[in-house]
Structure formats: C-alpha cells, structure tokens
Amino acid sequence: LRYSAAHSTIILKNTNISEIKVGNPHIKYPQEVSFQINDFEKIIDFEGSHNGYLRKFKKIIKRKIIIEKNEDKIHGEDSIISLKSTNSKTVYHIRFHLMPDITTNITTNKKNIILKTKKNKIWMFKSNSELGLEKSIYVDNNSTKETQQIVIKGITDSTKNIEKWSIEAI
C-alpha cells in the first residue's frame, strides 16, 4: 500500500508521489496539498489538489467530485495541469479500486462498466475515455483478497488534460 498505484488516484508514468521507508520519515511527499468541501442544498462538492508530480513532471494534479444528494449519482473530474509548456508526453493512469464482492462487465465500446454488488444493486461507471479492468488486491485485517480496478489510461499534452467520469445506480 506504499505505492500510488495502490490507491484510487492519478499516477503519472508509474511514479509514486511519496516514498516511505520503514524506520525513516517520508523522504519524498507533496509539498502542497489542498482540499475543500462545499455542502449545498442538492450536492456535496469535493475539490482537492497536490503538487506531488511538480518536481519531476512540472504538473499539478486536481480532482473534483460531486455527489448528488437526491440521486444515486457521483460525477468526477481528474485534471493534470502542466505548469511548463513542453513537448514531452507522459503516460498516466487513473485507478478506481473495487471491493472484492463487486462483479464487473465492460461494454463493447469500452466507455462503460457495469458494476453489480453482492446485494444485486447495479451501477454504471462511465467515462468519455476508454476504460479497462485490471487485477487488484484488497487488504483487510492483515488478509488479502483478489479484486479488480477500473483504469483510465492516457497521455498528457503540453497544457491540461481533463478526464470526466461518473458512477450512477441504474
């Protein structure tokens, strides 16, 4: 769980945003982390960002999540913002780790994944980008279980990349 890829977040070029060594304090971590919650009548809005990739990639990471209070729907937006114009392209992955009891089916256009809970509730994860499913591990009370993760893959451009996604009950 020390690796960024073990979390539901953006990872640039399979690089961790922090390093932890047993017996030592953090030797690398984001210097600036911001987080804000707004609770409105119909939605709850979460916004966060960090500069964990600033030194190596000259990029800031932002995530915005909107939860609709009266509907079973969540909207998300992950942004990679370049602070220095460059022609270099960087591969990124946005990972969403699932609980072990969730079953999945990806649609033929690879833009939607149907999620089914143990209690037979059906959810649809949607993205404008192509989605993939990969193996993952769930850790609970010193035991591990195999599970899956939803992955959005892309390549950064020189200014700003925005990936929009949503999950809703159907």
Residue ranges and their predicted role:
Residues 1-170:
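CBM-like, beta-strand-rich accessory domains located in the C-terminal region of large
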